[in-house]
């Protein structure tokens, strides 16, 4: 009995009907089917996804990154990586991103928390964060309304803001200060179209997409640097001008993309 063939047959019998497991890999090297990869857990593995940071980061840090003109960090440091290993993302992570002064704007430090029971210290008067109705759930499960939902806390010079995810409106805390400043705050402009309409109208040239490449490209690069820190469990120092990691040769080598597997090369020719 060819044990390798027998094992492969077991994997094939698990593949859902109608699923092209080879095509599912796209550029990634082939892995035998495993229900820990599909359906929902693929993002938890370094070979396939970017963990919670790559998944939720774009829905939480997008406005901060865009409107504060953050660009790329000069340093990313792992503060906590619970259950670190070389195969899949930690059970919980705390990362610190440092951005330099940008013109007249001061330096910014972002601390990212994700994972099981890994919460930031909440400021007085925080209250409860509301769960947005437009937040997608995992595998169609019902979202749980809890005190602390995905979101952000922004500490400015004189004010503290809290916000949720997916473009939710920021609010000032504590509530007493928000009420005192209510007549001084600018109106939040209403979007002329929703998320789906904007995409279609942008395709037709009637609107500008709200997340063009010049916005989401650098934002995704920030997340890639964070994921590298999670994977290597090392602080990285990044040269924003040369776009190279200057304190670790192995980490710097990872900036060069792994060649796509055979059959996918033509899609990566410039």
Where are these regions (language model features)?
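Single conserved hydrophobic/aromatic residue that forms the stacking wall/gate
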Residues: 1-7, 11
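Active-site-adjacent bridging/hinge elements
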Residues: 31-42, 68-71, 192-200
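Stable alpha-helical elements in mature extracytoplasmic
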Residues: 17-20, 60, 195-196
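Rossmann-like flavin
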Residues: 9-35
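Flexible glycine/proline-enriched surface loops and loop-helix/loop-strand junctions
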Residues: 40-50
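Glycine-rich "substrate-gating" loop/helix at the edge of Rossmann-like oxidoreductase active sites
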Residues: 48-53, 84
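Glycine-enriched catalytic-core subsegment of oxygenase/oxidase enzymes
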Residues: 56, 72-270
